[in-house]
A protein has these predicted regions:
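Short Pro-Cys-Gly-centered "Cys-loop" motif that presents a nucleophilic cysteine in a tight turn
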Residues: 1-53, 57, 66-180
Length: 180
């Protein structure tokens, strides 16, 4: 049976996420995380897809992307295949690394975009990390500093929406306080 067509976002923004097959760990160490970010950065640049936010957890990842040319499917296929080949070769395993086809949810408004940004950056806190500042495997620092130390994330479009780094950090602390 064919799969349903994916929803197309009018804004070009999407929430993209996937997890390990059977919830297995897909990032064993920092070298795996660096490799995944490199694969995403390289393949997305080739396909003109911009990463606006990201977060890597041990068994899953979240991305917020801008896909103005409808190239996300090809970019994800290339990036996830490259990473799966690397990880399977490194660990001596075979078969599917990821649970299923990645998930993609259309983001249709600035309000939804900010909510997604919050969700992505607060994901490590839900995973028992003490503070956002202490967790290095997300784009939070790009929003806190105004530039991405990993050079993968373009924070500028969302910082324009939220009123800059300082306002976003204050907003995120307020949101975190309401949730926890």
């Amino acid at each position: 049976m064919p799969r349903c067509a994916r929803a197309v976002s009018l804004t070009g923004y999407y929430h993209v996420f996937d997890r390990g097959n059977s919830k297995q760990i897909i990032f064993e160490d920092d070298s795996d995380r660096y490799r995944f970010l490199s694969d995403i950065s390289d393949r997305f640049a080739r396909h003109k897809v911009a990463v606006l936010a990201w977060c890597l957890m041990d068994n899953h990842f979240h991305l917020m992307v801008d896909d103005p040319y409808d190239n996300l499917s090809k970019a994800m296929q290339c990036a996830l295949t490259a990473y799966a080949k690397y990880f399977n070769g490194k660990t001596g395993r075979t078969g599917h690394l990821f649970d299923n086809r990645y998930s993609r949810v259309a983001v249709e408004s600035d309000t939804q975009a900010v909510q997604l940004l919050d969700y992505i950056h607060l994901n490590p806190v839900k995973g028992a990390i003490d503070s956002l500042e202490a967790y290095r495997w997300s784009s939070f620092r790009a929003y806190q500093l105004g530039y991405d130390p990993f050079d993968i994330c373009d924070a500028a479009p969302m910082l324009d929406i939220v009123g800059g780094s300082r306002r976003y950090c204050e907003h995120l602390k307020e949101v975190a306080g309401r949730i926890w």
